């Protein structure tokens, strides 16, 4: 008969028939034990003594599965961290094209990984398993379809692969305490976003991978020699000086004028000189565009090269406002850059807006066809009616179901009423030749009703001012 090892709590969910429990033991007894791999040719046996070894990890649970999880070192953050800690081989079995690399298995080599499910099931189910040396019943005990979340490209809706690759990082973990300290000084609306969603993100902050293998973007200003010497360039003047040194040493270089284009491919053409006399070429990466966004408070003034007074007068900024999804975007990058560069907070107040959904509460998407073009309403009801509808629909931090009928209703009830009041006054004032400057009556001489209207106007204006200060724009 077959003998299988799995978590006791999952026996009823996994096993297909009545079984006899031969032995019970803690999972820790398996740690350090070796096992036969399902695809032994994927990683050469001589490459690592730690490959195909049982490890312990606190993220393996008994809520589903078998209590035993396969670790793919190069294809997931938890897997990678565990693999580096245990010294597992960092070996890619999938290329940048999403296909299995040569040597994985004759029937899988060169094939797109997401198109091989049936082939892999067939290989594991065959007598002897994937290489013919396993049990006659095959290596696959059971297969089961189930639903789970999986990342997809937001543009193409194609499935994505987590993929370990060489990158440049900002060591955000080194400034974690400062991030938390500066965040505590921000006046958040609502406060539970700053303490909860954003605060939790900061408490679990990871180092920031800022390099991207793209053509368009801000080039990483780092030059490296073959022996590993590096220079980081901080200005055009510094680049010009380094280019001049390289030219004097005999390295050919293009001109580097004051208005040099600092983007690819121009910037890639400069060869610099290392301190030991070696040629240095630029690291072929551009920066994460979110890094650009985080530099906005000083980049807008071309600081530190110009406008020091204007920068000092406007930093940290008084107020920012964006959707709640920016807790991992702009809210974070602003704070990350300012904490690492200036050792200071980036903004004093932040209003975190709820996301705008369609009338049925679903996320708007071009592929779903439920996008609302705001210009349709601007041209029909006007921008003010659209703005007033959104302001009064509810608390700004709550998700909003955008209903086009609501804009039309706001236009009819609010703005048409205001227009009719104005039109009534304007028509009769013109008919009577009314001149507000010449015929104005002092407030103290006006009727009680007129004075009450003025008092009520100033009271409402004061309340609105106070509520706007507290981001209670819906009250």
What are these regions (language model features)?
Residues 87-98, 214-216, 239-399:
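Alpha-helical recognition segments enriched in aromatics with Gly/Pro capping
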Residues 473-475:
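Conserved small/polar residues in nucleotide/adenosyl-binding loops
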Residues 18-24, 37, 137-145, 279-282:
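Short secondary-structure junctions
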Residues 335, 415, 419-422, 426:
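Short, amphipathic alpha-helical segments that act as regulatory/interfacial helices
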Residues 1-4, 9, 29-36, 42-45, ...:
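Residue patterns forming the tRNA-binding/recognition surfaces of aminoacyl-tRNA synthetases
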Residues 218, 347-350, 426-441:
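Short, glycine/acidic-rich hinge or "gate" loops at secondary-structure transitions
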Residues 302-303, 398, 430, 434, ...:
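Short, flexible helix-adjacent loops and helix caps
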């Amino acid at each position: 008969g077959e003998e299988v090892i799995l978590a006791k709590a999952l026996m009823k969910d996994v096993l297909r028939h009545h079984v006899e429990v031969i032995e019970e033991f803690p999972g820790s007894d398996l740690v350090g034990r070796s096992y036969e791999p399902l695809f032994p040719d994927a990683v050469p046996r001589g490459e690592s003594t730690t490959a195909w070894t049982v490890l312990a990890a606190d993220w393996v649970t008994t809520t589903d599965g078998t209590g035993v999880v396969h670790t793919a070192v190069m294809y997931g953050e938890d897997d990678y961290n565990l693999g580096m800690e245990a010294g597992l081989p960092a070996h890619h079995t999938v290329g940048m094209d999403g296909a299995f690399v040569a040597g994985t298995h004759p029937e899988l080599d060169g094939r797109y990984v997401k198109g091989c499910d049936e082939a892999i099931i067939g290989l594991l189910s065959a007598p002897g398993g994937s290489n013919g040396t396993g049990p006659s019943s095959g290596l696959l005990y059971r297969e089961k379809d189930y639903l789970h979340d999986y990342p997809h490209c937001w543009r193409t809706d194609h499935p994505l692969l987590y993929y370990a690759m060489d990158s440049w990082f900002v060591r955000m973990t080194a400034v974690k305490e400062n991030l938390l300290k500066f965040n505590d000084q921000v006046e958040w609306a609502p406060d539970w976003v700053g303490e909860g969603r954003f605060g939790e993100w900061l408490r679990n902050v990871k180092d920031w991978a800022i390099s991207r293998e793209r053509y368009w973007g801000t080039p990483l200003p780092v030059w490296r020699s073959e022996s590993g010497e590096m220079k980081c360039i901080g200005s055009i003047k510094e680049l010009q000086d380094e280019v001049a040194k390289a030219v004097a040493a005999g390295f050919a270089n293009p001109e580097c004028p004051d208005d040099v284009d600092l983007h690819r491919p121009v910037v890639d053409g400069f060869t610099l000189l290392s301190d030991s006399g070696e040629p240095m070429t630029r690291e072929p990466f551009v920066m994460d565009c979110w890094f650009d966004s985080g530099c906005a408070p000083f980049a807008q003034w071309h600081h530190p090269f110009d406008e020091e007074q204007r920068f000092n007068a406007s930093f940290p900024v008084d107020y920012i406002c964006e959707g709640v999804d920016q807790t991992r975007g702009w809210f974070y990058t602003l704070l990350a850059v300012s904490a690492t560069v200036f050792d200071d907070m980036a903004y004093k107040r932040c209003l975190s807006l709820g996301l705008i959904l369609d009338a049925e509460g679903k996320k708007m998407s071009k592929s779903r066809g439920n996008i609302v073009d705001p210009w349709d309403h601007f041209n029909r009801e006007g921008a003010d009616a659209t703005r007033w509808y959104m302001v009064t629909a509810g608390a700004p931090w709550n998700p909003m179901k955008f209903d086009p009928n609501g804009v039309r209703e706001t236009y009819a009830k609010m703005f048409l009423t205001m227009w009719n009041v104005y039109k009534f006054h304007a028509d009769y004032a013109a008919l009577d030749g009314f001149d507000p400057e010449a015929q104005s009556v002092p407030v103290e001489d006006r009727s009680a009703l007129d004075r009450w209207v003025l008092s009520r106007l100033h009271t409402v204006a004061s309340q609105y001012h106070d509520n706007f200060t507290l981001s209670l724009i819906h009250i």
